[in-house]
Each structure stands twice: as C-alpha cells, then as structure tokens.
A protein has these predicted regions:
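Flexible beta-edge/linker motif
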Residues: 30, 59-124, 133-157, 220
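Elongated, acidic membrane-bridging lipid-handling scaffolds
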Residues: 89, 131-240
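Short, intrinsically disordered, charge-balanced linker/junction segments flanking boundaries
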Residues: 246, 250-255
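Extracellular loop and loop/strand-boundary signature of outer-membrane beta-barrel proteins
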Residues: 241-245
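Short, structured interface segments
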Residues: 126-128
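N-terminal type II signal-anchor transmembrane helix
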Residues: 1-50
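A short, amphipathic edge element
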Residues: 49-57
Length: 255
C-alpha cells in the first residue's frame, strides 16, 4: 500500500469517527435530560400499559446500551383512584434495533423496592388482565428479563371470598426470562408469606409455558419446584375446601 493510500484511509477513518462522535453527541444532548421529553415519554408508557405513569426523576446513560433509570415511579390503576405499582427505582436497558419496527424491547427491567397490588374481582377478572390483551393501537412492549428486588406483592381475591382474601409476599425477589405470550419463561421466586399475622417462607424455581395470545392467560402451564416453611394452611382453606372430604385444616406446612 502506497503512502498516499494510507493517508487517504486514515482521513476516511477520521471522518467516520468524527461523524459518529457528532451523532452520539446529538443523541446524548437530546436524551440525557429526560425532563425535557417528559410528556412524550409518559405518553408512550401510558399507551403501552394503558395506565397513568408518573416518576420523580429520570436519567439515561450510554454505556454498552441505552440504560434508563427512574426514581419515585408510580403506576396508577386504570380507574386512577389507586396505585397499581409504586417503586423506589426502576432501571431498564433498551434494545435499539427493535425500535426500527416500532417495537419497544427491554433487554432487562429491574425494579427496586416495588409495591405491587393484584386484585381479582367477584367475576374472576384480574386487574392486570388488560395487559395481556392484543391491541393494534398499543405500542408493542416486551421485556426479555424482569428482576424484582426486595418487593412487596399483595393479592386480594374477591372471587374466592366476597369480602376479599388478601395474601402478601414480603421481601420478594424474582427473576423471569422471556415472559412473552406463546413462549416458555424460566423463573425464580423467593419471598416471605404474610397472612393472618403469621409468616412463612416460599421459594419456587421452574418454567412457565405462557399461553398464546388467542388463549386465556390462565390456561398457561407451570412446571416448578416448591420449597415452603411454616405456611399457614388454614388461610387458604377457601381454595381447596371443595376438594377434600373433611373439615378445615389448621397448622403449618413445610415441604
């Protein structure tokens, strides 16, 4: 290679590097301050979740991939009267290429100290049921991995008892990979189970074969190992009473 060709290649490489640096600078300038795009961001999240979404502060870093961090996150229920999820911090890493197809794919979604409220009403409808519905006007939002650290999940079941039977998972740690309709998702869960002023421990690990978009979400199949300590079996009597030929069981279950 002649000296002239080497100089030409070096100049071309320098121009490309400069162009990439300028482009990165433009992107960083545009997005590092999320508050300037607060309304656009909230609109996208509201559309994807079909709920009001608020946050106190947000930041964005460009290391190996775009990483968004939000603090003071609040996701309202559909009626706006109560909170569905609150979290001290939510971090997610965004996959860039799916955006070209108008899809939002999160490589990793991590919630710290979230408080999650699940409800099943008297007709058997869950408050998260709408999140599994396919809608053409909804932004496609997928997460390849979801992680919960030190969470709290309360489940109130008004179908099993009209006044509501509430079970709470404290100190909840969860990891689930590829939680998508029609796919098999691997998961791990550990938590403290609080009910009727009693406390037990629960750990599960296995796979969830999630039903397709044309099937009810409750038709999903689960294959899991279970470890339990001091579970209050009497608290769950309404769920299994119809299947056993004896009176209410009391005591604690280890397995």
């Amino acid at each position: 290679m002649t000296k002239k060709k080497k100089i030409t290649l070096l100049l071309a490489a320098a121009v490309v590097a400069l162009a990439l640096a300028v482009l990165a600078g433009m992107i960083a300038t545009r997005f590092l301050n999320l508050d300037t795009h607060r309304e656009d961001l909230l609109h996208a999240l509201r559309t994807a979740l079909d709920r009001e979404v608020l946050y106190r502060e947000g930041s964005l870093s460009f290391r190996l991939q775009p990483t968004f961090t939000f603090t003071g996150v609040v996701i309202r229920e559909k009626d706006g009267a109560s909170d569905f999820i609150t979290a001290d911090r939510v971090t997610f890493k965004l996959a860039v290429l799916p955006l070209l197809k108008k899809n939002v794919v999160l490589r990793r979604l991590e919630m710290e100290n979230p408080r999650i409220h699940l409800i099943r009403d008297r007709s058997g409808i869950f408050n998260i049921g709408n999140l599994f519905e396919e809608k053409k006007d909804r932004i496609a939002l997928k997460a390849r991995r979801i992680i919960i650290r030190n969470g709290r999940l309360s489940f109130t079941d008004r179908q099993i008892l009209p006044e509501g039977l509430t079970t709470t998972l404290e100190n909840l740690d969860l990891r689930i990979d590829h939680p998508e309709r029609g796919r098999k998702a691997a998961f791990r869960i550990s938590a403290t189970v609080d009910d009727e002023s009693k406390s037990g421990k629960l750990a599960l690990a296995g796979t969830l074969d999630i039903s397709g978009s044309t099937e009810p979400i409750l038709s999903s199949r689960i294959d899991t190992s279970i470890r339990a300590e001091r579970l209050n079996v009497g608290w769950y009597w309404p769920y299994y009473s119809r299947y056993v030929p004896f009176r209410k069981i009391t005591g604690q279950l280890d397995m």
